[in-house]
């Protein structure tokens, strides 16, 4: 009986959503007939559940999307997770949705995600308030603002690498720790370190419940996550209060509490927590894939190591620390980052929702339908990237065609922290490539799919510091 009740609790919300979305699907079809425009080609699958089972029956969801694209073309309809959807997989269509007609498509997230991160976070906004938040975040994470952070980021990188030395670790989990520490530094600066450990613990509890069923009952992951979110908000509110009294700080929090920005404490807290969320897993995923790809391609690793050794030798001779200018000289390593983001395509797609009926290339996208630009399909299109499955950083010696490479999204909702993400990758690999060796078990090959595509089991790796006489 207990198992049955649990089954009902888990399944009932999904069935309710399916039923509501099923009615919307029928409404969309009727609207298409009424206005004389056809829906995009495709299949809506079974009543209520659509093609959800087909999507998840494949260990690799990209197989599902590729099959649909090959059959129907770069724009097609489907029905997954209770939602009628239009998938777009051409650079032109992605630009239409994310840039030129972005006002017709709003970002969409489950209500439970908004509750966890905070309803006033930048992800969930449009219009003037979103533009205001984006200006603040972009200013705080601009090259001019983060260039002075190199020594502090380098210190975090060195501590991380030292803790891995001689250990067999889960690479993804260690990269998440590194990315979280950099995120907290960039948000709060170095003056709020006394709160950092409690912030981390609350955030980690929140993260565990992020993809859980939103059932707020004692003992559930969701309930624990919401308690952690409340405590996290209280800690951030305390830090905000102290910072307002000081009225200084070149970090993100300093930008938020600037009296000219007119943000409430609740708005600031939601956005601080949202930025922590955005800054952690995606960056850690790219770093994990970089370790994997460099280990699989010795010639590329050799080129990266030689580039970094040249910079390291110059730093040693001058007695100066690593600087922002040094990271601008890391051309080969930067191309490795780009190619890693293309091949791995950490963000395979993004969700939007049509706010009104939209016509695109003679097709109707009905109001309320989800629209998913498929970044991975665009990044793996051989018309734009020959031999797309091959890891070849040299392809970025020439800039890709517009809208064919969108690792940070595109338009007003693209990632405003992309320069910080690239900086922390460059700093970490400067020391990793010059000072450490790594290896993994051959049995650990493979890919696992969750919110992000990752090497199997988070890429367990052994890291060992090189001897001083080794290159």
From Swiss-Prot:
Signal peptide: none annotated. It is an enzyme of class 1 (oxidoreductase). Gene3D superfamilies: Cytochrome P450. CDD domains: CYP90-like. Keywords: Endoplasmic reticulum, Heme, Iron, Membrane, Metal-binding, Monooxygenase, Oxidoreductase, Stress response, Transmembrane, Transmembrane helix. One of its GO terms (cellular component) is endoplasmic reticulum membrane. Its EC number is 1.14.14.137. It is a single-pass membrane protein. It is found in: Endoplasmic reticulum membrane. GO terms for biological process: abscisic acid catabolic process; abscisic acid metabolic process. InterPro entries: Cyt_P450, Cyt_P450_CS, Cyt_P450_E_grp-I, Cyt_P450_sf. Its cofactor is heme. Belongs to the cytochrome P450 family. Involved in the oxidative degradation of abscisic acid. This is Abscisic acid 8'-hydroxylase 1. It comes from Oryza sativa subsp. japonica. The gene is CYP707A5.
